[in-house]
């Protein structure tokens, strides 16, 4: 009953839930069916921000003022809540960056220093001077959102698409073959969708993550489409130090109910 009450509270707090919109047939009640793209705002979250956060808002780069200290505490509380929600531990970090999953992938690319300035690269052909065996390689799945594909293709890395199996999932046999084919590359990264934002097919992340780690590859998971609907475990509950624990996850919180206005979270 507690969960039912919570769901009812969320549903009844959606801003615009009873809103009408003019159309060719006159005003009609809005039926929102695009949660794959974005969630909608919740009244109790917006009320809390207006009444409890904004009156004390200040720059989080300083704690020398009371308002700066309070705003910084809010931010750090948010980090802790998110870390707990994804079963993170002291080895994991929560970052806030950019817009949605696009901002998170972009941040990881910058951290790994995988991108050259476009204008300089076009003028001097720096990427072409990197021999193939020295290039990083990125393995992606058959149904990636553009944020988990296009950004990787704009780096110095080679992007390898792993085809799907008969069930529409990442084909583990093909993934193993590709990992062996590129075994000598200096940096190997697997970046796969936890769920397709087109078909809704959910990937079993454990065997894919385990296979990536068995071949010394970093395991990244795009939970943009899946996060509002499935549990997320950064560290496998049965073996936190085991091969099924994830290295990086990408979350797009604006897809959650109450999420509009939030940053991406890697």
Language model regions located:
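Pyridoxal 5′-phosphate
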Residues: 1-266
């Amino acid at each position: 009953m507690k969960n039912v009450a919570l769901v009812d509270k969320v549903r009844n707090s959606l801003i615009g839930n009873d809103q009408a919109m003019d159309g060719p047939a006159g005003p009609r009640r809005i039926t929102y069916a695009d949660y794959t793209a974005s969630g909608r705002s919740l009244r109790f979250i917006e009320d809390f921000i207006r009444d409890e956060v904004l009156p004390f808002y200040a720059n989080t780069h300083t704690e020398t003022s009371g308002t700066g200290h309070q705003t910084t505490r809010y931010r750090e509380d948010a980090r802790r809540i998110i870390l707990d929600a994804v079963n993170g531990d002291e080895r994991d970090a929560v970052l806030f960056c950019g817009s949605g999953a696009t901002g998170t992938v972009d941040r990881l690319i910058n951290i790994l220093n995988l991108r050259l300035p476009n204008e300089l690269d076009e003028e001097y052909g720096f990427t072409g001077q990197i021999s193939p065996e020295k290039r990083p390689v990125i393995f992606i799945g058959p149904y990636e959102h553009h944020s988990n594909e296009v950004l990787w293709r704009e780096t110095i890395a080679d992007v390898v698409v792993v085809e799907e199996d008969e069930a529409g999932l990442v084909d583990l046999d093909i993934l193993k073959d590709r990992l062996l084919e590129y075994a000598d590359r200096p940096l190997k990264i697997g970046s796969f969708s936890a769920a397709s934002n087109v078909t809704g097919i959910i990937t079993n992340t454990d065997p894919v993550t385990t296979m990536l780690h068995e071949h010394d590859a970093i395991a990244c998971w795009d939970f943009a489409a899946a996060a509002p609907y499935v549990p997320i475990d950064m560290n496998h509950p049965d073996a936190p130090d085991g091969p099924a624990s994830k290295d990086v996850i990408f979350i797009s919180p604006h897809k959650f109910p109450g999420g509009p206005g939030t940053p991406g979270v890697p």
